C-alpha cells in the first residue's frame, strides 16, 4: 500500500522496465538516494502507523554482496566451481575468465521471471549455470539472530509444489555461514500433486519464524551457491533465479542491529 501510494503521489519508478529493473542503483545516484529516502519513511510507518501489525520489510539499503559471473554447469546443479575453494575478484576456469560485481539489497533477482522484459542482475542469463554470492557481516558481539533466507519466492496465485525435505528449492541452492551449511526449515506443505485447492505453507521466509543462527563477534562469512537448470520446470511454474538473505531479530520484527554488510570487510 505504501509503495503504491509513493508512486501515485510522487511518480517515478520508470527504471523498473526502462533501466536497472529489480536492481538497486549505485549509492551515489539520485535514484538510490530516492529509494533510501522512501525506505526510511516506510520503516517509520512500520514502527508507528502499523505498529503491532505484520510488516515483512527490513532495511536493505545497507546490505551489500559480491556476485560472480555465472559458470556453465552442464545441467549438474551440484557441480563445484572455484569460488567454493577460494574467494577472488577474478576466476580462471576452463580457459575462460569470470569476474565479480557488487549488488545491493536483501533480495536479488539474477534473472527476472519475465525474462528480458524486466532487467535483473545478469544482462543475458543462460540456463544451466551456477552463480555465487557472498558477503561478510560484522557483528559487534557474539549473538543469536534470526535469518530470513529463501531462493524461490512463491507466488500465492500459483499451485507450485513446496521444496523437498532438506532442500531449499528445486534448483539446488545452498547457504553457509562461517563455513557451516544452513539447512532449510521443515516445510509444512508436503503434497506432491499440484492443486489450486491446496494452500502453500511456510515456503516464503516472511511467512515463517526466522531461522535461529549465531553470529560471532567480528566478521562472519555468508556464502551462497545459486545454480539454475532450465528456466521452466514442472514443480514451479515461475522459476525464480534469486535469493533473499538478511539477518533480523529472533522474532523477525526488525533488522538485527549494529551489523555491517561488506564483501570487502569495510566498516
Give the role of each language-model region:
Residues 135-141, 151-155, 228-230:
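Beta-strand elements of well-folded, non-transmembrane domains
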Residues 118-131, 197-206:
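Extracellular beta-rich ligand/substrate-recognition surface
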Residues 36-128, 156, 187, 221, ...:
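Accessory carbohydrate-binding/adhesion or oligomerization-edge regions at the termini
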Amino acid at each position: 500500500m505504501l509503495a503504491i501510494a509513493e508512486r501515485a503521489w510522487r511518480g517515478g519508478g520508470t527504471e523498473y522496465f526502462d533501466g536497472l529493473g529489480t536492481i538497486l542503483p549505485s549509492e551515489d545516484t539520485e535514484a538510490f538516494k530516492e529509494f533510501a529516502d522512501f525506505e526510511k519513511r516506510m520503516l517509520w510507518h512500520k514502527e508507528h502507523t502499523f505498529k503491532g501489525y505484520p510488516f515483512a520489510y527490513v532495511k536493505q539499503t545497507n546490505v551489500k554482496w559480491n556476485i560472480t559471473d555465472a559458470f556453465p554447469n552442464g545441467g549438474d546443479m551440484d557441480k563445484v566451481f572455484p569460488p567454493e575453494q577460494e574467494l577472488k575478484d577474478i576466476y580462471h576456469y576452463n580457459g575462460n575468465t569470470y569476474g565479480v560485481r557488487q549488488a545491493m539489497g536483501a533480495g536479488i533477482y539474477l534473472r527476472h521471471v519475465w525474462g528480458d522484459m524486466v532487467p535483473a542482475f545478469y544482462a543475458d542469463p543462460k540456463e544451466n549455470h551456477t552463480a555465487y554470492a557472498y558477503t561478510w557481516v560484522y557483528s559487534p558481539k557474539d549473538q543469536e539472530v534470526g535469518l530470513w533466507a529463501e531462493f524461490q519466492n512463491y507466488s500465492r496465485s500459483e499451485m507450485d509444489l513446496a521444496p523437498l525435505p532438506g532442500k531449499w528449492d528445486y534448483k539446488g541452492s545452498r547457504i553457509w555461514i562461517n563455513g557451516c551449511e544452513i539447512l532449510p526449515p521443515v516445510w509444512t506443505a508436503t503434497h506432491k500433486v499440484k492443486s489450486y485447492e491446496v494452500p502453500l505453507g511456510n515456503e516464503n521466509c516472511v511467512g515463517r519464524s526466522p531461522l535461529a543462527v549465531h553470529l560471532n563477534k567480528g566478521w562472519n562469512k555468508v556464502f551462497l551457491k545459486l545454480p539454475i537448470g532450465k528456466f521452466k520446470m514442472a514443480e514451479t511454474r515461475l522459476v525464480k533465479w534469486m535469493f533473499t538473505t538478511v539477518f533480523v531479530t529472533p522474532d523477525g520484527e526488525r533488522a538485527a542491529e549494529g551489523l555491517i554488510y561488506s564483501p570487502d570487510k569495510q566498516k
